[in-house]
Amino acid sequence: MKSSWVKRAALCLSAAALAASALAACGGSSDESGPPELTFFVAIQPGGTIEEVSKRCSEESNGKYTITPEFLPTDASQQREQLVRRLGAEDSSIDIVGMDVIWTGEFANAGWVEEWSGADKKAVTENVFPNVIETASYEDKLYAAPFNTNTQLLWYRKDLVKQPPKTWDEMIEQAEGLKEAGTIQVQASRYEGYMVFVNALIESAGTEILSGPEEVDLEQDPTEQALQVIGKLANGGAAPPSLSTSDEDSARLAFEAGESAFMTNYTFAYASAQAEAPEIGKQMGFARFPRVDASKPSKPPLGGFNLAVSSYSKNKDVAFEAATCLANKDSQKTAVELDGLPPSRSDLYTDKTVTEAYPGFAQLVKESIEESGPRPTTPAYQDVSLAVQRALHPPDKIDSSDTESIYDELKSKVEDAVKREGLL
């Protein structure tokens, strides 16, 4: 069965090079002589989570289906582009889609993924964080099974910092007092990670970029307060020289090299430091993502990916069943164990698998997810994200003492973005 699928995949790849419309002709992930072979398009995880859960669910189906992962490019933009082209061509060779949390509005609005309902919906939303369910929903309908989620913590050097700061202003002040050892690592290159950073600051300040798929919010005073944080960091002594080109990995590497006292980053940073820089790792403290306004709780970033059933699958019924298995409690525990991916189910945060992966901070991760600020759900998300990046990058263009003009530019660009529903 596997060899026949490989032949079909090769034919599809050749057809893709000729024309996007030919992709649909390559559909058909079933072998008439056996159970449906479900193709699972998803980003690879280095620890092997996808292969392991696909194998287990296939075995547990008792011959009802087999799941074959088809790995997307490592770059998130290229992942989306490939899926947009295939789904836009009504490619029936895709059965299950691993969707970044920010794609839900776009894919659902385009009619590319199926709505979840009934027993399937109940099974995949049981004990799942409401904020995570929100990332899998569009216009009050569920379009994906929540699988893994993620959030950022404040990581700091316990040998340099006696008490972790509660606000960005406090952290910048502490960092500047530490001189060269006190830089702050964030994600501020011109890419989606910068949108994550900006959105978390705006949400933490008490407003949001969008209040609905096409409704711009961006209340002026709190938005300017968030922009002041970026400008103050970027133009002060706490900024590393590489701030405007920093991403999750470069931030991690700089922290592990002992170049910074503070870092906001995802949970993978802890395990990486323990393995790659144990002397730094043993001094690694953790705290909640800092506040923008001292009087308001922070709203940490929220990431992750969810599992959708393609509207063009020829095996939708079993695809829903398979996706339910891929997203179940056992699968989420596997994702924690093999790749350190936080589960979307709140009831797993006292499970030994999770507490061992996040020693001492499992409940902080849970709290951060519960009180996170998701990015907007809108069909025009890509345009909105690009608008934010264009308005606010490089970060040192923001004058913290005069943010009105940059606020006007940001709001204008976002308003233009929501008028379109660009797919590429």
Explain the meaning of each model-derived region.
Residues K2-A15, A19-G105, P278, D293, ...:
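Conserved N-terminal structural module of periplasmic/extracytoplasmic solute-binding proteins
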Residues F71-L83, I102, D169-E170, S242-E256:
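Short helix-initiation/N-cap motifs at beta->coil->alpha
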Residues V84-R86, S93-D95, V124-Y156, S295-K299, ...:
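A structural signal for short loop-to-beta-strand junctions that line the ligand-binding cleft
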Residues D95-G98, A261-Y266:
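Paired acidic/hydrophobic, glycine-rich loop segments that form the ligand-binding mouth/hinge
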Residues V101-T151, Q163, E170-I172, G182, ...:
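Hinge/lid segment of periplasmic solute-binding proteins
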Residues A175, E215-S244, F289:
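Glycine-centered hinge/linker elements that transmit conformational signals in sensory
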Residues K232-A238, A275-D339:
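Extracytoplasmic/periplasmic substrate-recognition and gating elements
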Residues E367-L424:
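Conserved C-terminal helix/tail region of periplasmic/extracytoplasmic solute-binding proteins
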